[in-house]
Curated annotation (Swiss-Prot):
Region entry Disordered, spans: 600-640
Role description: Acts as a chaperone.
Induction remark: By stress conditions e.g. heat shock.
Protein's UniProt name: Chaperone protein DnaK
Keyword Mitochondrion: no
Lineage of source species: Bacteria, Pseudomonadati, Pseudomonadota, Alphaproteobacteria, Rhodospirillales
UniProt xrefs under PROSITE patterns: HSP70_1, HSP70_2, HSP70_3
């Protein structure tokens, strides 16, 4: 039975884990790290880089290096948050053909699902290299406050990456699962999850293997990226005051600022002051300019105070929905890299009135929980029941543009709910069902998930036809909606896609593209390996020629030199087969050199040759072996 992997597809970093027996294990990637930067880059030569290699070249290739792509997944291009993001990143965000936010590199457009799929492929390969077998199934985590469009887009990313996504699981729920499996206790816990791009708060009851989510809340555009942006603005403004140059207008400088801001933020979790030092950050007519600014922890805390306070309102809402007071929470679990910040820890402590639990690794606990859920689905982990909730209310638009809820937020999923509606006009033969998700009273103020038409309704006065609308939310939190005319039995069903999201044809094309990229990556690896092998053979052959040139016949020597020249020419091109053929030819020429040397050794009776001296010599009764020591016979000892 093949393994199910658990993947935490994070905004900043991603992580993969598997179940080994009763324990979850986080797998190290090819670079030896337990987390992988959620970054994808395309080089000038068309090569695709994922993870650490992409991060390493970001400063010199900012326009084609994609990070924090999770913040765009399932979002419309005209969404105000998308427009805000455009000013924060050095890469191009464009409107896709379906109206969603896409990104562009070297003239080619990619959906956020496709970029995410490249990261998922990297996690899949990491697991396959460790297990030594193919992996086809996964549990992938998403922020609890992700809407249906974002969940569907994440599931699409899994499909593009060649994975069957068995379950989409909420990140705080996964963290609670990992915590609960270790603690084996009972009680009410709150999971405060502040990551690179999103914030979630979930309240759960744990007991006897049952993990029941009571409520969840959050902000899908609040995380470490926003904290970094505050530092970037501060550094840029200080530099502008001093030098009169706005670094944010220079994409290369902006990328260097971003890396420096992230580093400073991390350092200030452990120390009270740090220095941001960026030599040659820009230049003007007077020459190069250097940035050197001291940043204290207190200054950082002042800069991000509004962001920290923004996490409190969702906490209040989650407690209210769960019908609990802060004092009734038994344990607060901190998840996400941002929770290492002392200001966050202090804020959580003040709000909940207790010291938060910091015994879990905030970067890995979500992937561990996903692996455990994979074990539950495969039957490897027994006596665990996970009851999650839908984060946002679902409903349809009714007369006057009112949002009529069919399923309230924090309803346990999977769930199904039906309600009967009627026509608004006399002799109306068709109705358009518009599906929305959100908490506002008017439909237009909420997120539209999609729409469909129910046709062929018999003519009748308004209010007479009976149209039954059914909402069905599966365990992944993904919505299916159907509408049925009770008189005729006619039914129309849709699986809600990200409004204008990826069609099946889009996904199939992207799957093929991803497979092609994987094939290209394999070819590139083969090319590098072939060049390395050729380079090694050239080196050893040239050494043989330089050390033994005087002992080699001219013909063999010339043949080897010609083979080296031909191989060097082949190495300059990208034809793997040609490089291998020329490498084989040089190997043959090199073998002939070896034979010629062996023959020359025989003819001269050289050391080690049959019939030649083995390296020992006798002279004057004195026997010397390999010049290491001397044996003197007894007669000579006496005469001495």
């Amino acid at each position: 039975m093949s393994k199910v992997i658990g993947i935490d597809l994070g905004t900043t970093n991603s992580c993969v884990a598997i179940m080994e027996g009763t324990q979850a294990k986080v797998i190290e990637n090819a670079e030896g790290a337990r987390t992988t930067p959620s970054m994808v880059a395309f080089t000038q030569g068309g090569e695709r880089l994922v993870g650490q290699p992409a991060k390493r070249q970001a400063v010199t290739n900012p326009e084609n290096t994609f990070f924090a792509i999770k913040r765009l997944i399932g979002r419309r291009y005209d969404d105000p948050l998308t427009q805000k993001d455009k000013g924060l990143v050095p890469y191009r965000i464009v409107g896709g053909k379906n109206g969603d936010a896409w990104v562009e590199s070297h003239g080619k457009q990619y959906s956020p699902s496709e970029i995410s799929a490249f990261i998922l492929q990297k996690m899949k390969e990491t697991a396959e290299n460790y297990l030594g077998e193919k992996v086809t199934q996964a549990v992938i985590t998403v922020p609890a406050y992700f809407n249906d469009s974002q969940r569907q887009a994440t599931k699409d990313a899994g499909k593009i990456a060649g994975l069957e996504v068995l379950r989409i699981i909420n990140e705080p729920t996964a963290a609670a699962l990992a915590y609960g499996m270790e603690k084996k206790g009972t009680g009410t816990i709150a999971v405060y999850d502040l990551g690179g791009g999103t914030f979630d708060i979930s309240v759960l009851e744990i007991g006897d293997g049952v993990f029941e989510v009571k409520s969840t809340n959050g902000d899908t555009f609040l995380g470490g990226e926003d904290f970094d942006a505050k530092i970037i603005d501060y550094l840029a403004e200080e530099f502008q005051k001093e030098q009169g140059i706005d670094l944010r207008k220079d994409r290369l400088a902006l990328q260097r600022l971003k890396e420096a801001a992230e580093k400073a933020k991390i350092e200030l979790s452990a120390s009270m002051q740090t220095e941001v030092n960026l030599p040659f950050i820009t230049a003007d007519a007077s020459g190069p300019k250097h940035l050197n600014i001291k940043l204290t922890r207190s200054k950082l805390e002042a800069l991000v105070d509004d962001l920290v306070r923004r996490t409190i309102e969702p906490c209040k809402a989650a407690l209210k929905d769960a019908g609990l007071k802060a004092s009734e929470i038994d344990e607060v679990i901190l998840v996400g890299g941002m929770t290492r910040m002392p200001k966050i820890i202090e804020t959580v402590k003040q709000f909940f009135g207790r010291e938060p639990h910091r015994g879990v690794n905030p970067d890995e606990v979500v992937a561990v929980g996903a692996a455990i859920q994979g074990g539950v689905l495969k039957g490897e982990v027994k006596d665990v029941l996970l009851l999650d909730v839908t984060p946002l209310s679902l409903g349809i638009e009714t007369l006057g543009g009112v949002f009529t809820r069919l399923i309230d937020r924090n309803t346990t999923i999977p769930t199904k709910k039906s309600q009967v509606f009627s026509t608004a006009e006399d002799n109306q033969t068709a109705v358009t069902i518009r599906v929305f998700q959100g908490e506002r009273e008017m439909a237009a103020d909420n997120k539209m998930l999609g729409q469909f038409d129910l046709m062929g309704i018999p003519s009748a006065p308004r209010g007479v036809p009976q149209i039954e609308v059914t909402f069905d939310i599966d365990a992944n939190g993904i919505v299916n909606v159907s509408a049925k005319d009770k008189a005729t039995g006619k039914e129309q069903t849709i699986r809600i896609q990200a409004s204008g999201g990826l069609s099946d044809a889009d996904i199939d094309r992207m799957v093929k593209d991803a497979e092609a990229h994987a094939a290209e990556d394999k070819k590139r690896r083969e090319l590098v390996e072939a060049r390395n092998q050729a380079d090694g053979l050239i080196h050893t052959t040239e050494r043989t020629l330089s050390e033994n040139g005087d002992k080699l016949p001219g013909a063999e020597k010339s043949a080897a030199e010609a083979a080296i020249a031909e191989l060097r020419t082949a190495m300059a091109a990208d034809d793997v087969a040609d490089i291998k053929a020329k490498t084989d030819a040089l190997a043959q020429a090199s073998m002939k050199l070896g034979e010629a040397l062996y023959k020359a050794g025989q003819e001269t009776g050289g050391p080690g040759a049959p019939g030649g001296d083995s390296g020992a010599s006798e002279a004057g009764g004195e026997k010397v072996v390999d010049a290491d020591f001397e044996e003197v016979d007894d007669d000579r000892k006496k005469s001495a």
